[in-house]
UniProtKB/Swiss-Prot annotation:
In the N-terminal section; belongs to the carbohydrate kinase PfkB family. Catalyzes the ADP transfer from ATP to D-glycero-beta-D-manno-heptose 1-phosphate, yielding ADP-D-glycero-beta-D-manno-heptose. This is Bifunctional protein HldE. CDD domains: RfaE_like. Its EC number is 2.7.1.167, 2.7.7.70. The active site is at residue 264. Homodimer. Pathway: Nucleotide-sugar biosynthesis; ADP-L-glycero-beta-D-manno-heptose biosynthesis; ADP-L-glycero-beta-D-manno-heptose from D-glycero-beta-D-manno-heptose 7-phosphate: step 1/4; Nucleotide-sugar biosynthesis; ADP-L-glycero-beta-D-manno-heptose biosynthesis; ADP-L-glycero-beta-D-manno-heptose from D-glycero-beta-D-manno-heptose 7-phosphate: step 3/4.
C-alpha cells in the first residue's frame, strides 16, 4: 500500500505545559552493596532527554513540523541542558524562567534493560504568575494550526481554562493530555486524550467497549469537548465524537519494551497531523501507528517520518525498514540498550535472487538485528559499469526492507561502506564471497571496537550478472 503522509512541513504547533528533563544512568550490575541489600550499578553511560511537554514538542519536530515549546523552568543546568538539546532538534523554546524553583528532573537508573529506581527533583510551579504564558500563546495563535496543553500536574497549566479560551476564540484546536480526575478544568477543549485508567478514574470502571462509548459520550456532553480519544494500551484506541460512530483502532505494536512517553507521541502526532490539514480520523490513524513504533523503544522517544511510513505499511517496530543514516544510528543505539546483537552486511543487491535471500537469512541467524547497507546508483555505476544498476536505489531498498530477515536498510554513496560501518560499529560484520576477513571494508574498525568479522558463502549458481546475461541472450533469439 502506498501511504501518503501528512504535509508535516506546513504544520505549526505550539506545546504549552509541564517541561522536564529525563536523565538516564546505565551500567552493569554484578554485586550487592555491603551497606544495604541493594544492587551496585557501575554507571558507564549517562543520557539526558527532554521529557513531559518537551517530549511532545520533540515528537512534533521529529516529523518535520514547526514545533514551539512554552513552559516553566528554573535557572539551572537542567534548563540549559533542555534548551540546548531541544534547539539541536529544531524545537523553538520560549521558557519562562522562575528563579525560585528548580527545573523538574527525573533520574532513572537502569541495568540489564531493567529500571531499578527513579529519583525526582522537583518543586511544583503552582502559584507562579501565568500571564507570561498567556502572552506567549497569544503571540503564536496566528501562525499555528494546533495548541497542545501537556498536563503533568506540576503547575504550568494552573490557568488551563484561560488558555483553552484564548485558543478557541482564535479558532485554533486545543488538544490536551489530561492529568487527574478534574475534567471540568478542561471544559471546551477540542480533544482530550486520556489513557484507559485516567478515563475510568473519571467515568468509572468499564466492563465492555459499549460502556466506554456510553460513558465517553457523556463526558463529551458534560464538559463540551469536541472529541475524546481513549488510549487503551494493547487494545488500541477508541475515538468518540458527537453524531458519529465510535472508531476503534487495534494496536500496531509488535513488541513492548517501554511505554514511557507513549502518550506524548500520540498527542504530538495528532497535533501535527491536524495542523497539516488532515481530518481527526486520519490523525488518529497516524497516531496509533506511531504509538506502535515508540513503545518498542527504551525511554522517552520520538518517531521519524520514515518510521511512521514504515509503520503504516505494516512494518511497525523500532524503525524497521528503509532508514537514513542518522535514524539507523538511533535504532542501533536502542537495540544495544535492549541487549540485542547487531549484524551488518552490504552489497548492490540489484536483481534480488535466491542466493541473496538465502545469504541474508543466514546472516540474520547470527544475531538479533540485521542491517543491509546498499550501494547508491552512482556507487553502483562506478563499481559495475554504466549499464548498472538495473533497478534504482529506492526499489532495491524497498525490496530488501520487505524481507523478513532484514531489519534495517540504509544506502551509502562511496565505493565502499567503510565510513558508514565505522559510524555504526556493528557487533558482527558479514560479507558474502571469497574474501579474507581483513579485506572486508570496515573490518579494522569493527575489530578495534571488539566486534567480529565473518565471511559467508553465497549459494552456488546464483548471480545477478548471469541473470542479466540470460535475459539478454533470450531477447536476442
Amino acid at each position: 500500500m502506498k501511504v501518503t503522509l501528512p504535509e508535516f512541513e506546513r504544520a505549526g504547533v505550539m506545546v504549552v505545559g509541564d517541561v522536564m528533563l529525563d536523565r538516564y544512568w546505565y551500567g552493569p550490575t554484578s554485586r550487592i552493596s555491603p551497606e544495604a541489600p541493594v544492587p551496585v550499578v557501575k554507571v558507564d553511560t549517562i543520557e539526558e532527554r527532554p521529557g513531559g511537554a518537551a517530549n511532545v514538542a520533540m515528537n512534533i519536530a521529529s516529523l518535520g513540523a514547526n514545533s514551539r515549546l512554552v513552559g516553566l523552568t528554573g535557572i539551572d543546568d537542567a534548563a540549559r541542558a533542555l534548551s540546548k538539546t531541544l534547539a539541536d532538534v529544531n524545537v523553538k523554546c520560549d521558557f519562562v524562567s522562575v528563579p525560585t524553583h528548580p527545573t523538574i528532573t527525573k533520574l532513572r537508573v537502569l541495568s540489564r534493560n531493567q529500571q531499578l529506581i527513579r529519583l525526582d527533583f522537583e518543586e511544583g510551579f503552582e502559584g507562579v504568575d501565568p500571564l507570561p504564558l498567556h502572552e506567549r500563546i497569544n503571540q503564536a495563535l496566528g501562525s499555528i494550526g494546533a495548541l497542545v496543553l501537556s498536563d503533568y500536574a506540576k503547575g504550568a497549566l494552573a490557568s488551563v481554562q484561560q488558555m483553552i479560551q484564548l485558543a478557541r476564540k482564535a479558532g485554533v484546536p486545543v488538544l490536551i493530555d489530561p492529568k487527574g480526575t478534574d475534567f471540568e478544568r478542561y471544559r471546551g477543549a477540542t480533544l482530550l486524550t486520556p489513557n484507559l485508567s485516567e478515563f475510568e478514574a473519571v467515568a468509572g470502571k468499564c466492563k465492555s467497549e459499549e460502556e466506554i462509548v456510553e460513558r465517553g459520550m457523556k463526558l463529551i456532553a458534560d464538559f463540551e469537548f469536541s472529541a475524546l480519544l481513549v488510549t487503551r494500551s494493547e487494545q488500541g484506541m477508541t475515538l468518540l465524537q458527537p453524531g458519529k460512530a465510535p472508531l476503534h483502532m487495534p494496536t500496531q505494536a509488535q513488541e513492548v519494551y517501554d511505554v514511557t512517553g507513549a502518550g506524548d507521541t500520540v498527542i504530538g502526532v495528532l497535533a501535527a497531523t491536524l495542523a497539516a490539514g488532515n481530518s481527526l480520523e486520519e490523525a488518529c490513524y497516524f497516531a496509533n501507528a506511531a504509538a506502535g513504533v515508540v513503545v518498542g523503544k527504551l525511554g522517552t522517544s520520538t518517531v521519524s517520518p520514515i518510521e511512521l511510513e514504515n509503520a503504516v505499511r505494516g512494518r511497525a517496530d523500532t524503525g524497521f525498514g528503509v532508514m537514513t543514516e542518522a535514524e539507523l544510528k538511533q535504532a542501533v543505539a536502542s537495540a544495544r540498550k535492549r541487549g540485542e546483537k547487531v549484524v551488518m552486511t552490504n552489497g548492490v543487491f540489484d536483481i534480488l535472487h535466491a542466493g541473496h535471500v538465502s545469504y541474508l537469512a543466514n546472516a540474520r541467524k547470527l544475531g538479533d538485528r540485521l542491517i543491509v547497507a546498499v550501494n547508491s546508483d552512482a556507487s553502483t555505476k562506478r563499481l559495475k559499469g554504466e549499464t548498472r544498476p538495473v533497478n534504482p536505489l529506492e526499489q532495491r531498498m524497498i525490496v530488501l526492507g520487505a524481507l523478513e530477515s532484514v531489519d534495517w536498510v540504509v544506502s551509502f554513496d562511496e565505493d565502499t561502506p567503510q565510513r558508514l560501518i565505522a559510524g555504526v560499529l556493528p557487533d558482527l560484520l558479514v560479507k558474502g564471497g571469497d574474501y579474507k576477513p581483513e579485506e572486508i571494508a570496515g573490518s579494522e574498525e569493527v575489530w578495534a571496537n571488539g566486534g567480529e568479522v565473518l565471511v559467508l558463502n553465497f549459494e552456488d549458481g546464483c548471480s545477478t550478472t548471469n541473470i542479466i546475461k540470460k535475459i539478454q541472450k533470450d531477447s536476442d533469439k
